[in-house]
Amino acid sequence: MYNYKGIYKISFLFSCKHESSLFSLHYLCSMSEDTYKTIVAPSEGIYTEKRSKFIAIALPVRTVEEVKAHLETYQKKYYDARHVCYAYMLGHERKDFRANDNGEPSGTAGKPILGQINSNELTDILVIVVRYFGGIKLGTSGLIVAYKAAAAEAIAAATIIEKTVDEAVTFLFEYPFMNDVMRVVKEEEPEILEQSYDMDCRMTLRIRQSMMPKLRARLEKVETLRFE
């Protein structure tokens, strides 16, 4: 895992002596802002303590609607469990989140689950922890440890990937300037989402957010090109 703070500090010190490195500093900071980590597929983990069984499920999600659908599914599947607690985090900025104790003492279930999501810097993820009571009370600290450990097991079993935040741009241009446009596309390597060729050509490209300003700046120099 990259230590962006460390990179930032080194680049800043270097830029104090070399003004030309300011672009590198800006690029490194932008790179850290348009990436995020999530999981590829569902994974599970199990933790037991004093005969209580904690079953954790980590699921990739994109919306609150998906979260609700998964919760309904697992609440039905584990209808006989004492508690079905959860936490989720959504969006590349990691601002949309929630933790739920589902009847456990306040802060003993949802919060430690969310803590594991945060410690792994994940988003677009839902972690559900199902508890089957074993007849022996664990106490507040015991519950916190158990829910944290179960969530950690599920996340550890998952495949974590880093994704980029992408942006799309659509523009029109006249056919005689096709070579100029394609030269930019070849060198900047955006993904072509849509293209149509006539006397007035239309194209939609997608590229990493931090690289969009450069792409647009180069396209703006192509004669007759105009953005939609």
Model-inferred region functions:
Residues M31-G107, E194, K221:
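C-terminal regulatory domains involved in ligand/effector binding and gene-expression control
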Residues I160-Y175:
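Short glycine-/aliphatic-rich beta-strand segments at the starts of folded cytosolic domains
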Residues F173-E189:
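Short amphipathic alpha-helix segments
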Residues V184-K186, L215-E223:
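Short amphipathic alpha-helices in soluble, non-transmembrane regions
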Residues I192-Y197, K221-E228:
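Conserved short beta-strand edge segments in small beta-sheet-based binding/regulatory domains
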Residues L205, M211-K214:
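Terminal, non-globular segments
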